Amino acid sequence: MARDKQSALIVAAFVLLCSGCLCGVADGAKGGRKTKGPVIGIDLGTTYSCVGVYRNGHVDIVANDQGNRITPSWVAFTDDERLVGEAAKNQAALNPDRTIFDIKRLIGRRFDDEEVQRDVKYLPYKVVDKGGKPYVEVRVKAGEVKVFSPEEISAMILAKMKETAESYLGQRVTDAVVTVPAYFNDAQRQATKDAGTIAGLNVPRIINEPTAAAIAYGLDRKGAGEMTNVLVYDLGGGTFDVSVLSLDHGVFEVLATSGDTHLGGEDFDRRVMDHFIRLVKRQHGRDIGGDGRALGKLRRECERAKRALSRQHQVRVEIEALFVGVDFSETLTRAKFEELNMDLFKKTLGPVRKAIADAKLKKSDIDEIVLVGGSTRIPKVQELLKEMFDGKEPTKGINPDEAVAYGAAVQGSIISGEGGAETKDILLLDVTPLTLGIETAGGVMTKLIPRNTRIPVKKSQVFTTYEDHQTTVSIKVFEGERSLTKDCRELGRFDLSGIAPAPRGVPQIEVTFEVDENGILHVTASDKAAGRSKSITITNDKGRLSQEEIDRMVREAEEFAEEDRRVRERVDARNRLENYVYRMRSAVRDGGMAGKIGDDDRERMESALTEALEWLEDNDGGARTAEKEDYEEKLKEVEQVCGPIIKQVYKKSGDASAGAGDDDDVNEL
């Protein structure tokens, strides 16, 4: 742009016209339309989502149609149907390029974002650039290829949670409080609200996940007399947040927040996946990094292994037909899992220290540590946190998977007025996670709202022109803590035109930042002399959905329907054969029965079992994959060898117990 027509601003004599903060509000409905009926609470997670409803004086976490209280944040398409939740996740191995997950890591981001590009390498589905935003390209029913925005996919998950709540309540639901990571920026927050609209929901309030969890923790102790400093450590599937709050007679005041919107259980899974990808390449000379089907199988087993290692010290990772002709089977120990992820575990401690320092507290001032998110079940995470706080044990009183939805449901009850005496005195005072400002001359980040400022907040500052006779100024809005805008994240920009020509430094341009209770930023610039002004809601103007796009997506969302899952008889038949073979092998080699089998019979069984396992390896992948009937026939063959021998052993054992046997091994034990 020409410097004589449009240029940066300079601060005019450092005049700060209005720097006061507006206090938080107890009633989250003040910023939105009046609600009718229940306002549900939805925790829209990276890997799992959860919904809560407040009624009869308490919160109910609602189970889905599979009986589970958390629902996988997965969506899939087949030629005949769309699947959401467990049904989508369960068929992922067979349908990897049409199964979508981790969409929360794409929402509100630019396609060229470094983290988006890093994620895309691990995703089996296709992510394309549309208008600078990451869109998902997928083949839907009848072979039609469509592209979906992250908001649309998120809306499908929100709609599933909405339907779950409606089935439980027996009535239509139109309003929901939806949670987001505390470190989500404006674009991500607005995109989440747009997803709610597409799902047929009014979202009167966006609430930060750690704050919602603090409500779940603090509700039962609302009557406690003393003030309590609480640190919420929220490590989920894809994001990490830390918030320090003070709880005092129902007042939940966030003192500071910190975190990483790209750190969580998915990253731990990927470290394990990378480990096994290297192992497969070393053992079989094949790189499966670009094989979507193999990665899908590996991803599922790595997640299962991670969960198991929170309860046990080692787990067997077994994958049938990882690729053609190869079944994968390796042991993963807790020690190896911790070694692969130790730097990520330790990375979470930095934001903890930062949040405590920003709250102007010391470690010893923290009264309670509340763990939220499924990844906090990892023993090493708990151990590192305990060490950091000199042996202080985290609170175990709340369910880490459900606490966020619980708190969101409480906030929903406040908005709807259904909370009653239990919630009427609750006051939420949240903060901005990052500093907000504009670019001034020389690329300087001029800060208007510092991080951890209580919201809602409104601040104004007067700037002036940089060039003589400048008639247009460009307002560039950034968030971040660095002194130069090149090191911060641009949120949006707009131009204020029609400024009367004058020497530099004469015009007075007042810029006002206002952050609402949802953490969404609104910016206004006005020429004080001419009375001309312009304003925008900052939601990453380069990638924000237009109202027309949202309306179209709402219509398309209404066309999809929930359908049935695919049955996998062949896998069941294979598993029956494999389970029988390993059970018989255990009987031959271990336990009290092994000594009661004669040498000839043992040799016959070992031979049949070994042959069956070799047959499984040879007929389980590619063109040689066996069918259901083949597995059943092989099982009959093995049973014909092993069955009579085992029956004879049981018969002898029965005779021996009657005193009639002469088994040499009776007294071995």
From Swiss-Prot:
It is found in: Endoplasmic reticulum. A motif (Prevents secretion from ER) lies at residues 666-669. InterPro entries: ATPase_NBD, BIP_NBD, Heat_shock_70_CS, HSP70_C_sf, HSP70_peptide-bd_sf, Hsp_70_fam. Induction: By dithiothreitol-induced endoplasmic reticulum (ER) stress response. Induced by tunicamycin-induced ER stress response. SUPFAM superfamilies: Actin-like ATPase domain, Heat shock protein 70kD (HSP70), C-terminal subdomain, Heat shock protein 70kD (HSP70), peptide-binding domain. Functions as a chaperone during endoplasmic reticulum (ER) stress response. This is Heat shock 70 kDa protein BIP2. It comes from Oryza sativa subsp. japonica (Rice). The lineage of its organism: Eukaryota, Viridiplantae, Streptophyta, Embryophyta, Tracheophyta.
